[in-house]
Amino acid sequence: MSDSLWHLYLLRTASGMLYTGITTDVARRLAQHQAGKGAKALRGKGELTLVFHCEAGDRSTALKLEYRVKQLSKQQKEKLVIDQPRLLTTLFLAS
């Protein structure tokens, strides 16, 4: 599983909150969240909408990228949703 391609995703709750996560299968993970079997932070938050996702490389890179995105302000996350960049690794993890 370490060779799997990971993805970073953002979900919007009914109240407008943005949730950031990583997975190897975006559709499966969204279904888990919608069924209340995903992150506790999303339980009882109403309808969830996938508003952004992109490839994030291997698990290690995905975890680093997730951390960086979670540090962004809501305004910066909204810009990601609007701009829909295909690769965040070049934006956040460049040496």
Swiss-Prot record:
Species: Yersinia pseudotuberculosis serotype O:3 (strain YPIII)
PROSITE patterns for this protein: GIY_YIG
Top-rank taxon, per record: Bacteria
One Pfam family matching this protein: GIY-YIG
Protein family membership: Belongs to the UPF0213 family.
GIY-YIG domain segment(s): 4-79
Name of the molecule in the record: UPF0213 protein YPK_3712
Stretch forming the signal peptide: none
PANTHER family to which the protein is assigned, alphabetical: UPF0213 PROTEIN YHBQ (PTHR34477:SF1)
